[in-house]
């Protein structure tokens, strides 16, 4: 279960660019999503300094750009999440999970992209982090909202299941670091001249 819901909101201009320029190379390492649902741009200097999240980069704060990223965020068949930037896929480095959930005071839940969701399952790891499975997929409840989650659990609305952090990617079919996967794939390819 990758939690991949094909983005019904993808911008028409993005879809048109994908058709017009189908062979634009994918981009790795330039965008990160932290455990609080914040987006980070990672330039070459940041990437050279280390992997995400140790080297986060510059937080995106421009509202229209944040909305554009949110509308064009989805995953591929390998569980790698990306932002479709016109004809180019910009793969996202995840600090934790592909979705970050935020609770409102009334108990409602929203994704880091602003979509209202319903908790279908609740999981808690060995560190006490709370994860939810929703109709959009699997994600972490941001740490600021764990107190509100405790109320949901105490009232019996959520029945938490134990989960090991090390099992999350395989259980829910997502890739935290498409960049690391890409590096590994490049190392395994035979060199054209050496074959």
Where do the model's predicted regions map?
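Detector for glycine-centered tight turns/loop "hinges" at secondary-structure junctions
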Residues: 37, 46, 88, 127-128, ...
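Long alpha-helical, hydrophobic tracts
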Residues: 3-63
């Amino acid at each position: 279960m990758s939690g991949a819901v094909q983005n019904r909101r993808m911008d028409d201009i993005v879809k048109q660019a994908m058709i017009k320029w189908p062979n634009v190379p994918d981009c790795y390492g330039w965008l990160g999503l932290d455990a609080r649902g914040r987006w980070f741009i990672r330039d070459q200097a940041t990437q050279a300094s280390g992997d995400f999240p140790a080297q986060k980069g510059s937080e995106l704060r421009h509202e229209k750009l944040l909305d554009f990223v949110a509308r064009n965020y989805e995953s591929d068949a390998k569980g790698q999440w990306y932002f479709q930037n016109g004809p180019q896929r910009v793969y996202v480095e995840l600090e934790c999970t592909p979705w970050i959930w935020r609770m409102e005071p009334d108990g409602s839940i929203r994704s880091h992209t602003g979509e209202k969701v319903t908790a279908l399952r609740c999981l808690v790891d060995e560190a006490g982090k709370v994860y939810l499975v929703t109709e959009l997929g699997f994600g972490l409840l941001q740490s600021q909202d764990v107190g509100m989650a405790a109320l949901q659990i105490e009232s019996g609305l959520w029945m938490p299941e134990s989960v090991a952090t090390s099992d999350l990617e395989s259980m829910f079919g997502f890739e935290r670091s498409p960049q690391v996967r890409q590096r590994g794939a490049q190392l395994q390819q035979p060199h054209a001249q050496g074959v």
